[in-house]
Amino acid sequence: MKASMFLALAGLVLLFVVGYASESEEKEFPIELLSKIFAVDVFKGEERGCKGFGDSCAPGKNECCPNHACSNKHKWCKVYLGK
């Protein structure tokens, strides 16, 4: 029951996004939509002094942004949730 409700809700959200995308004539629509959904501006290509989520890093060098940590296993910055 919960799974079917989740799938129905996900389908409605997908239908809304596709409908909104079909009405939009701007080329940067996907970037704007993702920026609004996640409330971040990582898509503009701005230079910053730290590495964000998914950027490659070297463990132990503290290159990742605050609230992120370099994964020893995957060698990229992940969100640090603490222990």
Curated annotation (Swiss-Prot):
Cystine pairs annotated here are: C50-C65, C57-C70, C64-C77
Modification Leucine amide, positions:
L81
| The keyword Acetylation belongs to this UniProt entry's keyword annotation | no
Instruction: Name a Pfam family for this protein.
Output: Toxin_12
Q: Which UniProt keywords apply?
A: Amidation, Disulfide bond, Ion channel impairing toxin, Knottin, Neurotoxin, Presynaptic neurotoxin, Secreted, Signal, Toxin, Voltage-gated sodium channel impairing toxin
* Annotated Gene Ontology cellular component terms: extracellular region; host cell presynaptic membrane
Tell me the InterPro entries matching this sequence. Answer: Huwentoxin-1, Huwentoxin_CS1
Q: Where expressed (tissue)?
A: Expressed by the venom gland.
Proregion residues excised on maturation: 22-48
Q: Does the keyword Secreted apply?
A: yes
Localization of this protein: Secreted
Just give the chief location class.
secreted
Q: Which GO molecular function annotations are given, in alphabetical order?
A: ion channel inhibitor activity; sodium channel regulator activity; toxin activity
Q: Which segment of the chain is annotated as a signal peptide?
A: 1-21
* Quaternary assembly: Monomer.
Domain comment in the entry? The presence of a 'disulfide through disulfide knot' structurally defines this protein as a knottin.
Family, as annotated: Belongs to the neurotoxin 10 (Hwtx-1) family. 15 (Hntx-3) subfamily.
Q: What does this protein do?
A: Lethal neurotoxin. Selectively blocks tetrodotoxin-sensitive voltage-gated sodium channels (Nav). Does not affect tetrodotoxin-resistant voltage-gated sodium channels or calcium channels.
Q: What is this protein called?
A: Mu-theraphotoxin-Hhn2c
Q: What is the lineage of its organism?
A: Eukaryota, Metazoa, Ecdysozoa, Arthropoda, Chelicerata
